[in-house]
Amino acid sequence: MQTMNLVGAVSGRAPRSLTLALAAVALAAVPTAHAAEPAPALYNTVIEKLARGEQVVGGTVSTADLNVYCAMASAGFDFLWIEMQHSSLTYQEVATMIRACPGPAIPFIRVPDGTEGDIQKAVDIGALGIIVPMVDTLEKIQNAITFANYPPLGKRSQGGGQYGALWGRNYRQTANDNIMMVAMIENPAGAEIVDQIAALDDVDVVFVASSDLSSFTGLRQGDPSYEALVTKIKDATLKAGKYVAGPSAWKGTRDGYSFFQGPPETALIQSGARLSLRGEADDGQPRGVAPMEGSEGR
């Protein structure tokens, strides 16, 4: 604990590898998610689970409907992948969503871009994970890191936001240790410098964007050249001591992956509807539909 305080006093945040190592030690000694006076104070449970060697899965949300968001937040996902790059969601809408249901799933935002405005708005409304799309230059991810972190580590300004109401009065002192940075590798240019991207201390996760890699290269999964590209990204990430991410369809089918993007809410609604129409529950057992509106026979 004292070691972390000394390091933090010098740099503003200890190297993520040291943070996670100390988190793992603390969690081994205290089997609760929120240990008394942890060093550093961790409330991002995704960091805690990864430090324990567990895999994490996030559901994808692209709609501003609060009922849908809160259902996803309490469905059992480790985090929610709030999709702002490929949706019409506004920061005001996402702020309302996160405030309505800040957990149990931790809010991660895929920002439209890695600009100062996008990054600072995302963290100010309470995101504990920043997913940066199309990382194909060091400048892009370094810029995102800079504006996601308070000084002395970064240049995040201290302004208005709802983060304090969500994560506690000591947020300013603990934010740098709780906000995760996910770099998405979506094209050959990003794959070419993935070793440099993964080596950046404040990059926590490198995401292998399976569909976009296929789109940009013209290759399909299973093609030897595609698989070589995916393996290159994975190996460089693991060599740097970081976590490898991919689609949830790869969970259990590819080694070395710890962080997964799950299906969007629309796909899950469709899956649930099909199960209901077949008279089955998600455990595959037959179920009848109760005559009372709004309930199910279980």
Regions found by a protein language model. Give the residues of each.
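Bacterial N-terminal signal peptides that target proteins for export
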Residues: Q2-L20
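Bacterial N-terminal signal peptides
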Residues: S17-A29
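Hydrophobic alpha-helical elements and their junctions with loops/disorder across both membrane
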Residues: A28-P31, V244
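Expand to "…catalyze enediolate/carbanion chemistry for C-C bond making/breaking, isomerization
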Residues: A35-R298
